[in-house]
Amino acid sequence: MNNGILLNCQNLTKDYIEGSVTTRVLKDVTFSMNDKELVAIVGSSGSGKSTLLHTLGGLDQPTSGEVFIKGKSLQKASQDELAKLRNTYLGFVYQFHHLMADFTALENVLMPMLIGNQNKTEAKDRAEKMLNAVGLSHRITHKPSALSGGERQRVAIARALVNNPALVLADEPTGNLDHKTTESIFELIQQLNEDQGIAFLLVTHDLNLAEKLNRRLIMQDGVLRPEM
């Protein structure tokens, strides 16, 4: 896509149906994001933030509307094409790190590349590089239980970066962290954005964190609007 547009969506709606009750959680959402941009979506619990993020990342399908990554429609892609788009362009970070407890930090970061059948030696080198980039080169042999909350989230960020994504979608990445650790995670995001040109779209309830990003959007009752 031209003009540096990395991600955009047009007229997204999302309905959940329980019995005879239909609840619309996304209401005609239109949004775009440029290469290398840092964007925050803020809003109260239940406003539709996480649903939007999952839909933008192709993890959930909209009821209507369309999502484009680098001009390619997620809704028109086959399952194989969708997986390739996600693996090529996107990384994901969640509030709960979802690390595998029985594996070391290095093995956790390696996993997406091994699933993608990448060369094991090259994958290991890449994983070590990413752990070094997030400041954990000295902790690569530690399992999640031996890491602090901030360290576990750094491992999760490293895992999101191993396939060299253009965009990381982060759902409350600092939600379980104290203020000091939150600050360090934000500094890491800034550094990765500046050094590697990675764009970040953060869903967060932390207004202090959101204010530090390039752009802020507000989600309220399924409607996305610019910050006033």
From Swiss-Prot:
Residue numbers binding ATP: G43, S44, S45, G46, S47, G48, K49, S50
One GO MF term attached to the UniProt entry: ATP binding
Cellular compartment(s): Cell inner membrane
Enzymatic class: translocase
Main subcellular localisation: membrane
A biological process from GO: lipoprotein localization to outer membrane
InterPro entries xref list: AAA+_ATPase, ABC_transporter-like_ATP-bd, ABC_transporter-like_CS, ABC_transpr_LolD-like, LolD_lipo_ATP-bd, MacB-like_ATP-bd, P-loop_NTPase
One GO CC term, this protein: plasma membrane
Entry superkingdom: Bacteria
Signal peptide: none
Keywords assigned: ATP-binding, Cell inner membrane, Cell membrane, Membrane, Nucleotide-binding, Translocase, Transport
Record membrane topology: Peripheral membrane protein
Sequence ranges assigned to domain ABC transporter in this UniProt record: 7-228
EC code(s) of this entry: 7.6.2.-
Annotated function: Part of the ABC transporter complex LolCDE involved in the translocation of mature outer membrane-directed lipoproteins, from the inner membrane to the periplasmic chaperone, LolA. Responsible for the formation of the LolA-lipoprotein complex in an ATP-dependent manner.
NCBIfam families: LolD_lipo_ex
Oligomeric and partner information: The complex is composed of two ATP-binding proteins (LolD) and two transmembrane proteins (LolC and LolE).
Family, per entry: Belongs to the ABC transporter superfamily. Lipoprotein translocase (TC 3.A.1.125) family.
The protein's name in its UniProt record: Lipoprotein-releasing system ATP-binding protein LolD
Organism the protein comes from: Mannheimia succiniciproducens (strain KCTC 0769BP / MBEL55E)
High-level lineage: Bacteria, Pseudomonadati, Pseudomonadota, Gammaproteobacteria, Pasteurellales
